[in-house]
Design a protein with these regions (language model features):
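Glycine-rich, flexible loop/turn motifs
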Residues: 44-46, 50, 448, 465, ...
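Extracellular LysM carbohydrate-binding repeats and other cell-envelope/extracellular binding modules
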Residues: 454-477
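Primarily a LysM-type cell-wall glycan-binding module
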Residues: 425-455
């Protein structure tokens, strides 16, 4: 939080920082966990670790953060954290000993998942390389923070939107106010480096991110066997960063320094498990926990529509295969796909088409067996919002592989419910009797999803209700 406040002060009072604002727009959320911070706790007051919760959204604060992000859809995201000083160890790393684990001031790495656009990943690695150089020149000890393809973690989550996403970690947890100025300075140096690079390469970054997001939308409209989703990513050791870092340690006995060999970071480059991207996911409307599932999807920015009761569609159903074993130990589950068959939904069903910017997030939620997020409630199954039938082994979850699902996967039942959202050239003007009663927890996005079938149409509601809705981010109940 303090590092963010320093950056705000810089942009208000420092001419060099103010000049950057001619090239970039910056949104700063200084702290999303004030209750936990007050209690010196990583978790929220309700016990949720928000940096492991970006997919399941147990914490209301994260749902609000996601809503704020979607207002801007920024091309670059900096996720700032502190790490813990873990004590001192012997060379065998198994017992307390002479040397502290590390003396890093700063650890930082970009999102590098194989589900992200390669051009965006390349920009992230170039920016991290600059940040390493800037930190070293500032007299700081900088290191890699490893990689993560664990989707519930912030750095990886925003990467699924093809943002250039970074984790910035500085020493702090458990340190109280010890070396406080140096810790805040470390945050400032890293954030300044990334923002300066973004300003210098603004056009390149904006074009790359826009192209990546457009590509995701286009791929989601047409089924291609070559277009796969990464479910379990590993490292061959052959794909390395072109920048290196060394670990510095100090003796707790005499203060002597020990420096490791400078090494690059090995990146995830191998698809150990994958599955072809569908054009839509389908969940029956009478599925247990459907309201919670829709809450999650709403706050992930997912567009969806409902099929009428009695609709029949040609789909593949997911089923439980068994534990997925790695080196003799279970690492989550493995799912399979039934042959394509006609399925009739007595109560209707919700369709989540993949021709949208949020499609990577939708896929990582709906695929039951994303090994990358095993143990962190990254999928609807891992979060136990859906489960397989213990007799048939089937999940209440289907995929569609026909092209252009918004026009080919539509209602054909007898219900009088509307089929799917329309996209008029101009917003239709509702009659005076078209009203909606706002309830606690509503947002314009959520209301638009329910009433218009598409959350991104929230601006239509806002434009028609400016007299009563003074701010699009605050609705009074």
């Amino acid at each position: 939080g303090e590092g963010a406040l320093v950056m705000i002060d810089n942009f208000v009072n420092d001419p060099a920082y103010k000049a950057l604002l001619d090239k970039v727009n910056i949104v700063i959320v200084p702290r999303i966990n004030p209750d936990g911070s007050y209690l010196f706790s990583r978790a929220t007051y309700d016990g949720f670790d928000m940096n492991r919760d970006h997919m399941s959204l147990k914490a209301a604060e994260l749902a609000q953060l996601h809503t704020a992000y979607r207002l801007f859809m920024s091309e670059v995201v900096l996720d700032t954290h502190e790490f813990t000083f873990y004590g001192a160890y012997n060379d065998d790393w198994t017992s307390a000993g002479e040397y502290m684990e590390n003396a890093d001031d700063l650890e930082t790495t970009p999102a590098t998942s194989l589900n992200n656009n390669p051009a965006v990943t390349k920009i992230g690695l170039d920016m991290a390389k600059r940040a390493f150089s800037d930190a070293t020149n500032a007299g700081l000890r900088v290191n890699h923070y490893g990689t993560t393809v664990n989707n519930p973690i912030g750095r990886a989550y925003f990467g699924l939107f093809n943002a250039v996403s970074f984790l910035i970690e500085t020493r702090g947890i458990g340190a109280g106010r010890q070396t406080f100025e140096r810790r805040v300075f470390s945050q400032e140096v890293a954030a300044t480096s990334y923002i300066t690079y973004a300003a210098e390469h603004a056009d390149e970054i904006m074009k790359a991110v826009a192209a990546a997001r457009a590509d995701v939308v286009a791929k989601g409209k047409t089924y291609e066997e070559s277009d796969v989703l990464a479910l379990y990513q590993t490292k061959s050791g052959k794909t390395l960063t072109d920048y290196t870092a060394a670990t510095v340690q100090y003796s707790v006995a005499d203060g002597s320094e020990k420096v490791s060999k400078a090494s690059p970071l090995s990146l995830n480059d191998t698809l150990t498990r994958s599955r072809v991207r569908p054009t839509a996911y389908v969940i029956p409307a009478d599925t247990a926990n459907i309201e919670k599932i829709l809450y999650i999807m709403d706050n992930q920015g997912a567009e969806y529509y409902k099929l009428n009761a009695g609709t029949t569609a040609s789909l593949q159903q997911y089923y439980y295969v068994g534990d997925y074993m790695v080196n003799g130990k279970a690492k989550g589950i493995e799912a399979g796909l039934r042959d394509t068959a006609d399925v009739t939904f007595a109560s209707g069903a919700y369709v989540f088409p993949m021709d949208q910017v949020a499609s990577n997030v939708i896929a990582m939620l709906c695929e039951p067996d994303v090994t990358d997020s095993n143990g962190y409630d990254g999928t609807l199954y891992q979060y136990k919002q859906i489960d397989y039938d213990k007799s048939t082994m089937n999940f209440p979850l289907y995929r569609y592989t026909g092209n252009d699902p918004r026009t080919t996967l539509v209602s054909n039942g007898t219900s009088a419910e509307p089929t799917q959202p329309t996209q008029p050239e101009k917003p239709s003007q509702p009659a005076s009797s078209d009203t909606y009663t706002v309830v606690s927890g509503d947002s314009l996005w959520k209301i638009a999803s329910k009433q218009l079938g598409n959350g991104s149409r929230w601006t239509e509601i806002y434009d028609l209700n400016k007299d009563t809705v003074k701010s699009p981010s605050v609705i009074f109940v």
